[in-house]
A protein has these predicted regions:
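Hydrophobic core residues within well-ordered beta-strands of beta-rich domains
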Residues: 61, 75, 91-93
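Short, conserved beta-strand element in jelly-roll/cupin
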Residues: 65-70, 85-104, 155-156
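Short, flexible loop/turn elements at secondary-structure junctions
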Residues: 67-69, 81-83, 97-101, 114-116, ...
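Tight coil/turn sites that cap or link beta-strands
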Residues: 71-73, 147
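Histidine-centered catalytic micro-motifs
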Residues: 74-82
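Catalytic core of Fe(II)/2-oxoglutarate
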Residues: 91, 105-160
C-alpha cells in the first residue's frame, strides 16, 4: 500500500512540484543509510567505465522508491538531468530497478529514446531487471492499466 508514501512530483527531494498530467504515482525518498547497494554501485561504476565515462565521482546520492498502483499512474517523457544554478547535485547516470514481477502489473512499460525521437526502446520490466542510462536521455513510464509496479531509481553524479 502506498499510504506512507508521498504523491509523485517532478524535481528533486528538496523542490518537488505536483503535475498530475505529467506524473502520477507514489514515492518515498530514501537516504544512503536506508539502502545498502554496494553491489549496485560497483555494477553502475563498471557500466559507466565501459559505456559512458560520465562524471559520477560522488557516487549515488539520491534514491527514490516509487509505486504505480492506480490505473492512471504514469510518468510522461522527461530527463533526470538537472544542471542549473539551483541544484547542488548534478545527476549524470540513472538506474531504474524493477521490484515487481511482470505478472503483478499490466501497462507501465519503460520507454527510452536512444539518441533521437525515431529510436524509442520499450521494456516490460520484471523483478530484478534494471536499466542504466545517462540522466540526459528522455524516458517515460506509460500509464498503468492494472496491478502494482514498484521500482527503485538511483541517481549517480557529482556535487557542484
Amino acid at each position: 500500500s502506498a499510504t506512507d508514501l508521498d504523491s509523485a512530483g517532478i524535481g528533486d527531494e528538496d523542490e518537488e512540484e505536483l503535475y498530475p498530467e505529467i506524473r502520477q504515482g507514489s514515492l518515498l525518498w530514501l537516504v544512503d543509510s536506508d539502502v545498502g547497494f554496494k553491489l549496485v554501485d560497483q555494477l553502475v561504476e563498471e557500466i559507466n567505465t565501459k559505456f559512458y565515462n560520465l562524471d559520477i565521482s560522488d557516487g549515488a546520492i539520491e534514491y527514490q522508491y516509487t509505486i504505480y498502483d492506480n490505473p492512471t499512474d504514469h510518468y510522461d517523457w522527461h530527463q533526470d538531468y538537472y544542471e542549473d544554478d539551483d541544484v547542488e547535485f548534478v545527476r549524470k547516470l540513472s538506474i531504474s530497478i524493477c521490484l515487481s514481477s511482470s505478472e503483478q502489473y499490466y501497462g507501465a512499460e519503460f520507454f527510452i529514446k536512444d539518441g533521437n525521437d525515431l529510436n524509442v526502446r520499450t521494456f516490460k520490466m520484471k523483478y530484478g531487471d534494471f536499466i542504466v542510462f545517462p540522466s540526459s536521455c528522455e524516458h517515460r513510464v506509460n500509464m498503468l492499466r492494472e496491478g502494482e509496479r514498484i521500482s527503485l531509481v538511483i541517481w549517480y553524479g557529482y556535487y557542484k
